[in-house]
Amino acid sequence: MNKSIKTKKQVSKTLIKLLNYKPLDLITIKELTEKANISRTAFYNNFHTLEDVLKYIYQNAHKQVFKDKYSHLSYEHIKDMIHFFDKNSKLLLVLIKWNLIEFIAKYNTEIVLSYTQHYKNKFIREHAFYFISYYHGSLFNICTYWIASGKQESSDTLFKMIKEFEKIKFVYNQKG
C-alpha cells in the first residue's frame, strides 16, 4: 500500500473515532494529526479540510458497495442502497449525531448526478436533478430513518416496504 493511501486511511479512521464523541466543528487538524500519528504536512499533502476527509470516507464506502454500476434503475440499486446504509451505519450514525448527514446527502447527489448521464431514459437525463431529489432523495431519507431508528426492520423487510412504496400511485379524490 502506498504511503498516501496509508495516510488517508489512518486520518479517516482517526476522524471517525473522534466524531464518536466530538462534533466536527470542535475537531482541529492539529488534534487529528496528533491522534493519527502523522505530520500536519502529511495531512495537507492529502486533504485541505476536515470536510475533505469526510468526503473521502464517504466516497470509499460508496465505491465499495455501488462500484459505479448503475446505468439504469433496478431493484438491485435499492438493495445496494440498503446494504450501503447497513454496512456503514456506524459512520452514518456519527454523521447524523453531529448533523453532518446533509453534507453526505449533498455529496451523494453529486455521485448520483454523474450516474444519470448514463441512464437510458432521456427524460431522466434531461431532468436529472429533479429525478435525484425525487427518487434517490427518498431512498436516502428512508435508509437514514431506518438506521437512526435502530434498524427495527430487517434489511429484507425494508426492501419489501420500499418495493410497495414504488407501487403506490398518487390518487386524487374525484369526489372533490
Where are these regions (language model features)?
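Amphipathic alpha-helical linker/stalk segments
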Residues: 20, 27, 57-81, 92-93
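Basic, helix-initiating cap at the start of DNA-binding domains
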Residues: 1-22, 26
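Amphipathic alpha-helical packing segments from all-alpha helical-bundle domains
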Residues: 80, 99-137, 141, 171
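N-terminal intrinsically disordered/low-complexity leader segments
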Residues: 1-4, 172-176
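The alpha-helix within a helix-turn-helix
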Residues: 33
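Short hydrophobic/aromatic patch on the recognition helix
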Residues: 37-46
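Short amphipathic alpha-helical segment with a characteristic S/N-K-E followed by hydrophobic residues
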Residues: 26, 49-54
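Hydrophobic alpha-helical segments that form the core
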Residues: 126-169
